[in-house]
Design a protein with these regions (language model features):
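Two-component/phosphorelay signaling modules centered on CheY-like receiver
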Residues: 10-29
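Acidic, metal-coordinating helix/loop segments flanking the phosphotransfer/catalytic sites
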Residues: 30-49
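Active-site T/S-Asp motif of two-component receiver
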Residues: 51-53
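C-terminal output helix
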Residues: 107-116
């Protein structure tokens, strides 16, 4: 299973990647914003799960989610948003855009595990 982690913070990408490795997800790609993520997705069509931050330069996570959902080949791709935007309105906006699950930073490894298992069924 291949995952793509998108966050402008290299520290947060490392935390998520290390957490995923402990959960036995070893095939993890990284991108620092939505523009780079879109390029990574174009070059690696076998990405199974997208984990993205919301607030990033260039193309933010919400814009990335909308772009991903506009492509038929990604319509069923599980997407988890990991962000500091924890208000009810933000969660609703993200879910309407196509996010499958939502994690508010800071979070524990157990939360990431639970949300990932949830989107994977």
């Amino acid at each position: 299973m291949r995952l793509l982690v998108v966050d402008d913070s290299s520290t947060m990408r490392r935390i998520i990647k290390n957490t995923l490795a402990r959960l036995d997800y070893k095939d993890v790609l990284e991108a620092e914003d939505g523009v780079v993520a879109w390029k990574v997705m174009a070059e690696n069509e076998d990405i199974d799960v997208l984990i993205t931050d919301w607030n990033m330069p260039e193309m933010n996570g919400l814009e990335l989610v909308k772009k991903v959902r506009a492509e038929a080949k990604y319509e069923d791709m599980p997407i988890i948003m990991v962000t500091t935007e924890g208000g009810k309105a933000e969660v609703i906006v993200a879910l309407k855009a196509g996010v499958n699950n939502y994690i508010v930073k800071p979070f524990t490894p157990a939360v990431l595990k639970e949300k990932l298992e949830d989107v994977l069924g």
